Amino acid sequence: MDVRQRLISSMVISLGLTIISEGIVLIGIASLLHISLFFIFPALVIFWLFQWIISPYVVGRGGYEVSPNDPQYGWLYNLVRRIAEESKIKPPRVFVIDAPYPNAFAYGNRLGGMRVGITLPLLNILDVDELTAVIAHEVGHIKHRDVEIGMTIGLIPTVLGYISTLLMNFGYLALFLAADEIELLFAIAALAIGFVIFVVTFILQIFVLWFNRLRESYADYNSFLVLGEGSKALATALAKIEIYMQNIRIDPFTGIIVTAPPVKVEEKDPHLLVEQWLRTKVSAFKDILSTHPYPARRAQMIYRLIYGSNI
């Protein structure tokens, strides 16, 4: 079984288990609360549509849209358009985003157009080949409809997460303001229910993250399909991002990402870091709580696609 077949088989299994687990939770909640599923489903659809409509404006806020004739970034638009055409999809809108970390992402909807966002630090640290490989990955997300699929598969955990947070915050407040035993018990009950929902959400999220990681790998596969051996640059792009992020810290008081003074990085050369990744044996649980596969796993898959098992 080749890489693509393994990916598709794993995605089918992951999606099936995710849908089954979310279905069990949904039916269980409906039974406990004596609420008809005919009420729950329309409510979920409305919430999904709300997210689908507003998410492009939330995710890409502050972004600068690039046009084909842009004097500074017109080349970037043309690069995205070329990759989209080679991927046989409509070219997405292109946005440059002033953020303190290197990143690229696909977002948008079919109303306002699909979009690719690229942050300034990413443009600064990648060469053209690496940027092309990253864009081919993001275009793969659009081609595979990962924005809509990810939003759908994560809908129930998202809603449950909001409910859990609301109940626990309410419980803490009620606990602080409790004037008698009845109010105290009410506060404890709210905290307990909120915690149980949190645990259920966490378990569901494990399945969702598994599916998301597989979709990321499938987007990497699109980079290989479009660029062939040129997709090797995706591995060095990941290495540069990894090295850059080791010089990033989060202010503990404000939660704002700030660039720290340069710190010692074990492997500053991205090519050497890729070589290290290719020799790394990655545990099956290494990225279990991550939205993306562990970088070493991604590099190994890319090289396996290009060179077969001889890596």
Swiss-Prot record:
**Superkingdom field:** Archaea
Q: Which Pfam families match?
A: Peptidase_M48 (PF01435)
Name it. Answer: Protease HtpX homolog 1
Q: Where does it localize?
A: Cell membrane
| Membership in a protein family | Belongs to the peptidase M48B family.
The record's comment on cofactor binding reads: Binds 1 zinc ion per subunit.
Cofactor(s) needed for function: Zn(2+)
**Name of the gene:** htpX1
* GO biological process annotation, one example: proteolysis
Give yes or no: UniProt keyword Metal-binding: yes
Q: Which residues form the active site?
A: 138
Question: How does the protein's chain sit in the membrane according to the entry?
Answer: Multi-pass membrane protein
* Enzyme kind, highest EC tier: hydrolase
EC number of the protein: 3.4.24.-
Which residues span the membrane? 12-32, 35-55, 159-179, 184-204
